Amino acid sequence: MNTATRVIVAQNVRTRNRTFQITKQGVVIVALVIALLCSAFGVVYFKDLNRRLFIQYQTLQREKAEELIQWGKLLLEQTTWSTQSRVQRIAEQQLGMQLPSAKEVILVNADAMIE
């Protein structure tokens, strides 16, 4: 082998057996890469969490609207069941009550009751 070939082969042998030294700069780079990956996974996780929570929020808003509609219907039904004519009809039919005549009505003076 000639001298030039020996030098090239010797350099290749040295680079193959090269040991890596842990330097402060290498540690910083590895730490930054790990921080970058954690940050990326965090962004993905929280975006997904935000999306799922927003869908849940919309579902709850829809349920609230449906419950308000149902509540309005129940209020209307309650008003219907408690109308004066219905109460009077049930009092007459089921309880045998009747409206008093004008002679049967007694007015009580509230001022006289206090004294």
Swiss-Prot record:
Its main location: membrane. Residues 1-25 are cytoplasmic. One of its GO terms (cellular component) is cell division site. It is found in: Cell inner membrane. GO terms for biological process: FtsZ-dependent cytokinesis. It is a single-pass type II membrane protein. Signal peptide: none annotated. Keywords: Cell cycle, Cell division, Cell inner membrane, Cell membrane, Membrane, Transmembrane, Transmembrane helix. Belongs to the FtsL family. Essential cell division protein. May link together the upstream cell division proteins, which are predominantly cytoplasmic, with the downstream cell division proteins, which are predominantly periplasmic. This is Cell division protein FtsL. It comes from Coxiella burnetii (strain RSA 493 / Nine Mile phase I).
